[in-house]
Amino acid sequence: MKTTDSLIVLHVAYITSDFASGVSTVVPQYLNEQSEIKDMNIALLNLTNYRPKDAKYPVFHQSCIEKLPEPFCNPSLVIFHEIYRPDHIKLSHWLRRRAIPYIITPHGSLTYVAQEQHHLAKQLLNVFFYNAFIRNADCIHFLSEKEAMSSNGFKHRKASIIPNGVSIPKAKASNLDSRIALFIGRLDIDVKGLDLLIKSLPLIADELRGLGAKIYIYGPDEDGSMAKLELLIADNQVSDIVLLNGPVNGQSKADAFLQSQFYIQLSRTEGFPTSVLEALAYGLPIIVTEGTTWKETANNKGIGIGVESDLEAISNAILTLFNDDEYRCKLANAARKYAIEHFQWKAIAKRQFILYRDIVNGLSN
């Protein structure tokens, strides 16, 4: 039962059916968890016409807050997801005129590497619109310390670090014989470091063929990236090792995790990649770069191998996890345990609620 003095929290996001999008995957999950908190009344103002499957909260598609039904036409707090959405500017102006606080969750879009993409266009947009949007936010909610540290080129009032959570599946990957490594995500070759992955494989191609090892890549095409990846795979003569697939979701996605021995993501920039967290929850060790924000954690917590963006280091890590079953199983057990102890949604949603309450009450430091 929601109380009359519950926080009225409106999330504003661009959610689609593209499950390779971290925002479209993770935001509906934590809104479902937040909807269970008795002292918080939440809704989603979606900037598309899509309604998230199994949503336990109201979903609106009207981009004018004052026309929303009670109580969301007068929210206690608004959460903006991502930065470069034009509707955010209009809505933030409306909020400021009414002294309604707002939080921005950039989802990695303020990092140095992310800002280098379409650099000139972003510089102009920042000067005219988004610097003020960020500066006037009551808090910037980062998903990791790495994201916060690499986003310090922007002035803001306050910052908070709360990671995403993950639903822990009942099943655990335990396939000792599959010899499959996995990547799931947008097929953005540069951002996701897929060029690094493919170019590292010729260094160990003979060993991988001897093991019968495969690299499965799943994800949607990104501006013709599927064809570019196919050419890159052919040029590096690893077409028999790398299997390139379209996007995967639901049970098919679960099966992809369950049939794999480890997960690999070599991103150059991320906020807090959902697929890495999902892999840990299934008990898959991870091979990750600094850009994923997981490199130090992988090494320090014994849940995978953190590597430099170096072809030899990447190939050595891949071969190690394919060859050493005992070591890989040790990492796998630690990976699932780490996800269970630190990233279950219920605990994450409680931390988010405390942040929201403190912002509304003017208590955030």
Identify the role of each PLM range:
Residues 72, 134, 247-248, 255-260:
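Short alpha-helical donor nucleotide-sugar binding micro-motif in glycosyltransferases
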Residues 268:
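Aromatic "clamp/platform" in nucleotide-sugar-dependent glycosyltransferases that forms part
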Residues 46-49, 184, 213-228, 246:
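Glycosyltransferase donor-sugar binding loop
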Residues 10-11, 141, 173-192, 198-201, ...:
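Conserved donor-binding/catalytic core segment of Leloir-type glycosyltransferases
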Residues 146, 165:
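Carbohydrate-associated surface elements
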Residues 97, 122-139:
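Membrane-proximal helix-turn-helix segments that form the acceptor-binding/catalytic region
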Residues 300, 304-312, 320-326:
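Conserved acidic donor-binding segment of nucleotide-sugar-dependent glycosyltransferases
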